Design a protein with these regions (language model features):
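Metal-dependent phosphodiesterase/phospholipase catalytic core, i.e.
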Residues: 38, 97-204, 234-238
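C-terminal active-site rim and adjoining tail of enzyme catalytic domains
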Residues: 134, 207-321
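Short carbohydrate-recognition loop motifs
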Residues: 318-342
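Secretory/extracellular carbohydrate-interaction modules
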Residues: 338-407
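Flexible glycan-contacting loops in extracellular carbohydrate-active proteins
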Residues: 459-485
């Protein structure tokens, strides 16, 4: 048995109940779902292909590596969690990705040089998730024992000691809690812990970084693995846009070890690699990327937290995320010239092939000095790959409104310049004044108009080239001081 082998090796080595979307709440449903202990063996037999592993819990939309994040991922259906482990100076194991507290918490400095008493004085703080998560009391950094006690045997856990000093204590805890059958050892592909885990009979999650993506490095990594392990590759080269060559993925797949990509944020990215025969995806938004239907027909900006499927270019970036500036508003106002959000929570639109309308309101806090500045709504995309004006990876259209009131409709695609389909003049926008906009999509035509000015001109275009169901919205302006606020976005 795996557990028996793991125990021997380890001893030798180290002689929607509560609503999980509400910050701070969420009760794991794993115990209600499981009919028996979930082991690596049972998960491998039942997971099918493709499968998904929850990355940092649901780290795109919840404070990463927190109990609410892990609970949310399990509530979404995850049967495998990825968990990072560090150790404090007094030997307490905690769940945190970085070696220091700086990036994700209110604490400062290295975990390893501070005692566990610091945990009572800090909390997880990731502003890009929304102000609902930055209110007091902040979400706590959990102890590993708390995580293993709640989820052990209910889901598979991929455990990584980010600080290698934590590895012996981490594995001793796993053994003490009788969880060896339910744990996969996660480690960097060249780690000395991989042969140690293999010798103990434990399966391995071996990952590469973008800098490692060569045939030679992949060959060396897979030489240490077998079909019971996972070879985990980055899905992009670090720009969140560019996929690796098909030939490289084929070479990795040829070794026979199940191939997994990470960290997946968008459905299109998972679909691309699944078509190449990749077995699984490590995803930071399990409930979104593991499904293919819309979760809502209107925004949830009043909640003051990012929604599942709502994606800036880089989901972990504070500078590219929206901000929540009033009761029900999302504001785009960073120092970036282009700031766009994929509205995946509303996608794919169920009526994409027939007729629907999009309605929302927008206002600039001050009018941009840049004459080319515009609000932009991208629509009819075939997938949820990232879009911003001037960068389109999918076929579709975008509708714009300039501060001078001009409305325009364009068609765009990855291999052709934007094509202006039509335009109309409406009264100029005033700073702080809300404009309500409406886009109507039918099988043969597109209408873009000001719903707040029903007698003004509209753009009517007869074009049926693309009718996908994905959306993005954003602003383009060289005048980064002008923030654009959005509210009341709905699909009907």
């Amino acid at each position: 048995m795996l557990g028996a082998l793991g125990g021997l090796g380890l001893l030798a080595a180290c002689s929607r109940a509560a609503d999980p979307s509400t910050p701070g709440s969420g009760t794991s449903s794993a115990s209600r779902r499981a009919t028996g202990p979930v082991t690596v063996r049972s998960w491998a037999a039942e997971r099918g292909t493709p499968f998904h592993i929850a990355h940092r819990g649901a780290g795109d939309i919840y404070p990463e590596h927190s109990m609410p994040s892990y609970r949310a991922a399990v509530e979404m259906g995850a049967q495998c969690l990825e968990v990072s482990v560090n150790m404090t100076s007094d030997g307490v194991l905690i769940c945190l990705h970085d070696l220091s507290y700086d990036r994700t918490t209110t604490g400062k400095g290295l975990v390893a040089t501070q005692p566990s008493s610091v945990l009572s004085r800090i909390g997880i703080r990731q502003p890009q998730l929304g102000p609902a998560w930055t209110r007091s009391p902040l979400t706590a950094v959990p102890r590993l024992e708390t995580v293993l006690t709640e989820f052990g045997g209910k889901v598979v856990i991929c455990l990584e000691a980010k600080d290698d000093r934590a590895y012996p204590a981490m594995m001793a805890m796993v053994a003490r809690l009788n969880l060896l059958d339910s744990v996969i050892v996660k480690a960097y592909h060249s780690s000395v812990r991989i042969p140690e885990a293999k010798a103990a009979g434990l399966p391995v999650f071996a990952y590469l970084s973008p800098a490692d993506m060569t045939v030679a490095t992949i060959d060396a990594a897979t030489a240490r693995l077998d079909r019971n392990d996972l070879l985990v590759l980055p899905y992009d080269n670090g720009d969140y846009l560019t996929y690796y060559p098909d030939e490289l993925i084929a070479a990795a797949k040829a070794h026979g070890t199940p191939l997994v990509v990470y960290p997946i944020h968008r459905r299109a990215d998972a679909a691309h690699y699944f078509k190449l025969g990749v077995s699984g995806a490590v995803t930071s938004d399990y409930g979104y990327t593991s499904t293919d239907t819309a979760a809502a027909t209107s925004d949830n900006w009043a909640s003051k937290r990012i929604s599942s499927g709502e994606k800036p270019k880089m989901p972990d970036s504070r500078s590219l995320a929206g901000s929540w500036t009033a009761l029900n508003e999302l504001t785009l106002g960073t120092d970036e010239k282009r700031q766009f959000i994929t509205l995946g929570q509303l996608c794919p639109i169920a009526a994409a092939a027939s007729q629907y309308r999009l309605t929302f309101s927008a206002a600039w806090d001050r009018l941009p000095a840049d004459p080319s500045a515009a609000l932009s709504l991208a629509f009819c995309h075939l997938d949820d790959r990232y879009y911003e004006d001037g960068l389109s990876l999918s076929e579709g259209y975008h509708a714009t409104m300039s501060p001078d009131g001009t409305l325009r409709l364009y068609r765009h695609g990855p291999s052709a310049p934007d094509e202006l389909l039509g335009q109309a003049r409406t009264p100029p926008v005033q700073a702080g004044q809300w404009a309500t906009l409406r886009l109507i999509v039918s099988p043969q035509a597109l209408i873009w108009r000001r719903a707040d000015l029903p007698d003004s001109e509209q753009v009517l275009v007869h074009d049926a080239a693309v009718r996908g169901g994905y959306l993005a919205i954003g602003r383009s302006s060289a005048d980064v001081r002008a923030a654009l606020a959005l509210r009341e976005f709905s699909v009907s």
